[in-house]
């Protein structure tokens, strides 16, 4: 469970949505104590979700995890260093597209999956009803990152194994074990729903400028909140406190 929560946090990089919004959109609370002073905060809520290719803040994800449904537990192998990103060129190692190369378009770290553009696809029917047979669409199936794909070396465009290393500047990079060439992380990985690159983003009226965010406005003091209000309002304390004793 902890692994799933950790991997789910990586989705924010693509969604560019507040973490509180993502957690609230998938939250399913069955019961909670009243918000009174004589109650401890306790809730009964769903903690296990079935993750698929649908993002956790979408309606499709909620439909697949409707309240009250029990799904078979999926065991996921933990990956310490996630090494595949959107925009990576990879080589397929299994299936009908074995040996072909493609570009990663979607990453699902909760299941150790990636989706490659135009590869490992199949036909499926959607929109079927009683009076409408539905339509057939082409859909790419996910590939497992530990056994179904491998990265392509940019020096010779051949599949290769790699490892993480540190440069002299302390930057962590992927290095091909065959050629020693650095495999850079694509710029596509920085894209979100709001912008292609962070530098190309245009600030809007409701955005907080970076200069305002970095401005230090808090000044630590020994005075209490009430003392600060009195100082700003020009109120002087002229009363003499009464003697008190502690036993």
UniProtKB/Swiss-Prot annotation:
Query: What Pfam families would the database entry show?
Result: KOW, ribosomal_L24
Extract the PROSITE patterns matched here.
Answer: RIBOSOMAL_L24 (PS01108)
The cross-references to SMART domains, in alphabetical order and at most eight, read: KOW
Cross-referenced SUPFAM superfamilies: Translation proteins SH3-like domain
Primary localization:
mitochondrion
CDD domains, per database record: KOW_RPL26
**GO MF terms, alphabetically ordered:** RNA binding; structural constituent of ribosome
Q: What compartments host this protein?
A: Mitochondrion
Q: Which GO terms describe its cellular component?
A: mitochondrial large ribosomal subunit; mitochondrion
Among InterPro entries, the record links this protein to: KOW, Rib_uL2_dom2, Ribosomal_uL24, Ribosomal_uL24_CS, Ribosomal_uL24_KOW, Translation_prot_SH3-like_sf
- GO biological process, any: translation
Q: Which NCBIfam families match?
A: rplX_bact
The entry describes its oligomerization and partners as: Component of the mitochondrial ribosome large subunit (39S) which comprises a 16S rRNA and about 50 distinct proteins.
Under what name is this protein listed? Answer: Large ribosomal subunit protein uL24m
Query: Which organism does this record belong to?
Result: Drosophila melanogaster
- Organism classification, top ranks? Eukaryota, Metazoa, Ecdysozoa, Arthropoda, Hexapoda
- Its gene is mRpL24
């Amino acid at each position: 469970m902890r692994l799933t929560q950790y991997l789910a946090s990586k989705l924010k990089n693509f969604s560019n949505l507040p973490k509180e919004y993502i957690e609230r959109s998938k939250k399913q609370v069955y019961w909670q104590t009243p918000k009174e002073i004589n109650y401890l905060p306790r809730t009964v809520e769903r903690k296990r979700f079935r993750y698929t290719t649908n993002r956790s803040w979408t309606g499709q994800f909620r439909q697949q995890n409707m309240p009250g449904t029990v799904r078979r537990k999926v065991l996921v192998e933990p990956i310490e260093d996630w090494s595949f990103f959107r925009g990576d060129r990879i080589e397929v190692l299994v299936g009908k597209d074995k040996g072909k190369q493609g570009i990663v378009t979607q990453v699902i770290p909760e299941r150790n999956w990636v989706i490659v553009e135009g590869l490992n696809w199949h036909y499926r029917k959607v929109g079927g009803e009683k009076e409408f047979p539905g339509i057939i669409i082409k859909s790419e199936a996910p590939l497992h990152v530990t056994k179904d794909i491998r990265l392509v070396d940019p020096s010779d465009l051949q599949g290769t194994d790699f490892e993480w290393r540190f440069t002299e500047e302390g930057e962590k990079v992927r290095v091909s074990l065959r050629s020693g060439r650095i495999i850079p992380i694509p710029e596509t990985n920085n894209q979100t729903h709001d912008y292609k690159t962070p530098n190309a983003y245009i600030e809007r009226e409701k955005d907080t400028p970076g200069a305002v965010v970095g401005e230090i406005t808090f000044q630590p003091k020994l005075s209490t909140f009430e003392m600060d209000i009195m100082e700003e309002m020009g109120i002087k304390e002229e009363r003499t406190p009464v003697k008190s004793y502690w036993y």
